[in-house]
Structure formats: C-alpha cells, structure tokens
Design a protein with these regions (language model features):
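Conserved cofactor-binding/catalytic machinery of classical short-chain dehydrogenase/reductase
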Residues: 13, 36-39, 51, 77, ...
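NAD(P)-dependent short-chain dehydrogenase/reductase
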Residues: 100-149
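Conserved Rossmann-fold NAD(P)-dependent oxidoreductase catalytic core, especially the SDR/UDP-sugar
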Residues: 35-85
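NAD(P)H-binding glycine-rich loop region in Rossmannoid oxidoreductase-like domains
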Residues: 1-35, 46, 63
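A recurrent short beta-strand within the Rossmann-like NAD(P)-dependent oxidoreductase core
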Residues: 163-169
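Catalytic helix-loop patch of NAD(P)-dependent Rossmann-fold dehydrogenases
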Residues: 67-116, 138
Length: 169
C-alpha cells in the first residue's frame, strides 16, 4: 500500500517503476498499472513528497501509422485502447499531467524509456532475438528504441537527484 509505506517512510523522492509488461488479464494489469500509479501519485501528494520519478513507455503514444519518427515529448499521447499496455501507459501519463497542474509542488520526472536490455534481462522483445529469424516486413521501417540497464540506472539516479523535471523520451 503506497499510502502506508510513503506515510511511514516520508521519502523526499519516490521512484515508481511498477508496470505489467508480460501478458496477463487486462483487469490485473489495470490494477497494477493504472490504479497502482493513481495510488502512488495520491500518496506522494498527501505526504509531501518533493519529487516523483516515473518510467513510462513509447507505447503511451500509441501504435499509429501517422506517428512521427522519432516521437518527441510534445507529440500527442494516443495510446491504443485495444492494447492494454499502451492504453494503461496513456492513462498514467494523463494522470501525471493532471497532477502537474493540481499539485505543482510535486516535481515530476517522467522517463519515456524504450525496451530495456541488459545481462540476465528477458522480456517479450528480447525473446524475439532468441528466435532463429527476426520477423521484418520488407520496405517497412519498424523503429525500436533500446536502452541498456546501466544507462537507465544512471538516468534514474540523476532524475532522483538534482536533474531537471519534465517528460523525457
């Protein structure tokens, strides 16, 4: 329970990484991704947390043929309702945007990270690279953005400290 933990510890900074990436029921994923994030944001606001660092995903922009390449921070958040992960990331980013207006004293750093790669890390995207062939469509770009675990750790450390606030792809 974020209210209990944040209320007991009274941290200056909260780093919120929780998200469901692997397939599960939509209801469970929603409870973790959206309801959990809502509770973290509310608990941070209630208990006077100075800074909230959240990892998001490019999936929040949605999977649309007219998305610009590359996507930048000012592009519209249009997560697809038909894809739970994309829809949930959109909802969380919308909640964060609302909180920036309602609770401006809660500094936010929203990191829109790509697929995380690193030693011992396995996910749906890394599984594609273990197959005998990597599926691609000729003449069709499919841009992926990757980040190494160590680089992400350094970015999170800076975000939790004196780094700038805002949304960063």
């Amino acid at each position: 329970d974020p209210y209990e933990v944040i209320g007991r510890e009274l941290p200056d900074v909260v780093i919120h990484l929780a998200s469901i990436v692997s397939p599960t029921t939509r209801a469970f994923a929603h409870s973790v991704d959206v309801v959990g994030s809502r509770n973290v944001i509310a608990a941070c606001s209630l208990h006077g947390v100075r800074r909230l660092v959240v990892t998001s995903s490019g999936a929040a922009y949605g999977y649309h043929a007219d998305n610009p390449v590359p996507l930048v921070e000012t592009d519209a958040i249009r997560g697809n309702v038909e894809f739970a992960y994309s829809d949930h990331k959109r909802q969380v980013e919308e909640m964060l945007a609302e909180a920036r207006k309602a609770v401006p004293e809660l500094q936010q750093v929203v990191l829109v990270v790509g697929t995380v790669l690193g030693a011992g890390l396995e996910n749906q995207i890394t599984a594609l690279f273990h197959k005998p062939r990597l599926l691609a469509l000729r003449g069709c770009e499919s841009p992926f953005v990757f980040i190494w675990t160590r680089d992400l750790a350094r970015i999170l450390k800076r975000a939790a400290g004196a780094g700038p606030t805002g949304v960063f792809n």
